From Swiss-Prot:
Upper lineage: Eukaryota, Rhodophyta, Florideophyceae, Rhodymeniophycidae, Gigartinales
Record family assignment: Belongs to the cytochrome c oxidase subunit 3 family.
Record EC number: 7.1.1.9
Name this protein carries in UniProt: Cytochrome c oxidase subunit 3
Localisation per UniProt entry: Mitochondrion inner membrane
Amino acid sequence: MTTLSQISKSVQRHPFHLVDPSPWPFVASLCAFSCAIGGVMYMHAYVNGSFILSISFFCLLLVMFTWWRDVIRESTFEGHHTGIVQQGLRFGVILFIISEILFFFAFFWAFFHSSLAPTIEIGSIWPPKGINVLNPWEIPFLNTLILLLSGCTVTWCHHSLVSNLRNQSVLSLFLTIVLAIVFTTFQAYEYSMADFRLSDGIYGSTFYMATGFHGFHVLVGTISLAVCLIRLLQYQLTQQHHFGFESAAWYWHFVDVVWLFLFVSIYWWGGS
């Protein structure tokens, strides 16, 4: 028979969420490490390098799905995401975006270090000899307009969600996802049409690392927005509780800003 003291001990007396033990952080770390190993093997043309990279990336996406499933269950169905918990989550997302900014800062540092003082090995000029750079006013400029437009549509969705305009929220978020897919398609087409590759010296390595890493962030942001669209259609995002979408929107605006720096620095200035 349950006594009153036992019930009192089982009642949570604080607004914080004590997360249950989860395997996903450890498994995600293993998948990310495997992706790095597979990427290095693929770049150096090792046997099965592309296979390891593909399998590791698929496993990473699967872990993202299962981890988000647990977080959504804890927030939407179990009610663990109180106001204080959401404040902590917002702070965590801000720190995550800051760490991503530092990541891209390293790529820009490598690019400007090589372009502002080109060495004799590449002809003491920038772009290096033998590199046919891409025209910044073709696909890159079109992709810039697409990403800027997607930033407008995701802001439209946020304002519609706060104003409880459900139909506009669904429409604007759907348009954002479509624009993201179009951007990724054009980026892949641009890669296929480029005359230089990742192994073509410092220009190719800095170009593909910076733009490719940004493309990976676009893919992650697209998946995040797609999850938000599914949750919005299932009435899991409301006028008062929509932190999942809010964090995805922050992330998407970060992707927009990074692309503007990439376009101005690498495509426009770096290719002139």
